[in-house]
Amino acid sequence: MDQDKYLPELVAEKESLDASFVHAMRLLAEEIEKFEGDELRKDGEVKKYLDIISNKNIKLSERVLIPVQQYPKFNFVGKLLGPRGNSMKRLQEETGAKMSILGKGSMRDKGKEEELRKSGEAKYAHLSNDLHVLIEVFAPPGEAYSRMSHALEEIKKFLVPDYNDEIRQEQLRELSYLNGSDDPSRGRSARGRGLRLTSTASPRGRGSAAPPAPPGRGAAAPRGTVSSRTSVPTPARGVSAPRTRGTAGTPGYRAPSLQATHKTYEDYGYDDGYDGEYDDQSYESYDDNYSNQSKSVSEYYEYGHGNNDENYNNYEEDWISSRPNLKAPASRLTRGGYRDHPYGRY
């Protein structure tokens, strides 16, 4: 049937009919409206009106072409599916649409694909078409078109022929995790004890400076160490300098800079008490100490940790004996204009 001649014939037939032919006039009017509104699809299916008042579910389907002809060496099917098909599953859950990879090259076994294509069955007819992604949505009109729009935007990201994009890197990490090569215990041991640094300091004793914290902004001093009475360690960038009670800086004296080395605490022969504490300290506690940059270094000192009462008393006596060498704090000056007592004496 010639579509160009069909519409003029319908109009001419409607004009020639008598008004008594009510049903014939109605059918001709409906047929003319279909062609005038250009609502006839290429496949012959007539487009119906969209009813949004009843909010009934409608079915939408779109076929997205995969650019295998422009990029024949790129594996689009593998990128769309992901490790064990997880990428496609997550994409369907996020968009609320059903997706299927159809067409020539959609099956891994090429021999079986060719056999099924030649079988002539209706369900394998798509193997004769180009490689594409079929997106289907079944929902109320407003939600259906919203899901379809979201699905088209997400599927577009997977059709970029890039081996180093964010989607590809995430799939490689997921694949390594599924294969068992990513062991969480290795990362914990590496960050827990293997990254602790110390300086070339003298053996541990009363009044010695605490080992410096690992490098980084906002790093805190290790727990269980005794602060120095003679010099204050240089704080890290972004951390306030710790101050001890009753001490004053010596004029003209600068504390020597401590250079960090890659030796661990075990190289200096620390006693078992300190080693046991670092062994028991878990990976989470280190993260809490290093992530809190707003606290000062002095808040992490624990004076007298691991020592008995006798050693603590000796340390207090030594500190009191060295007290006369320091200047006494100046007393607050009072104004002479005020009386000693607010009320008069009787």
Swiss-Prot record:
Cell compartment(s), UniProt: Nucleus
InterPro entries attached to this UniProt entry: BBP-like (IPR045071), KH_1_KHDC4/BBP-like (IPR055256), KH_dom (IPR004087), KH_dom_type_1_sf (IPR036612), Qua1_dom (IPR032571), Sam68-YY (IPR032335)
Described function: RNA-binding protein that plays a role in the regulation of alternative splicing.
Name of the coding gene: khdrbs2
UniProt region (Disordered), positions on chain: 175-291
Name of the molecule in the record: KH domain-containing, RNA-binding, signal transduction-associated protein 2
Pfam families given in the database record: KH-I_KHDC4-BBP, Qua1, Sam68-YY
Biased composition (Low complexity): 195-224
Primary location group: nucleus
GO MF terms held by the record: mRNA binding; poly(A) binding
Keywords assigned by UniProt, alphabetized: mRNA processing, Nucleus, RNA-binding, Transcription, Transcription regulation
Entry's Gene Ontology BP terms: mRNA processing; regulation of alternative mRNA splicing, via spliceosome
PANTHER family, sorted: KH DOMAIN-CONTAINING, RNA-BINDING, SIGNAL TRANSDUCTION-ASSOCIATED PROTEIN 2, RNA-BINDING PROTEIN RELATED
Annotated organism of origin: Danio rerio (Zebrafish)
Xref: SUPFAM superfamilies: Eukaryotic type KH-domain (KH-domain type I)
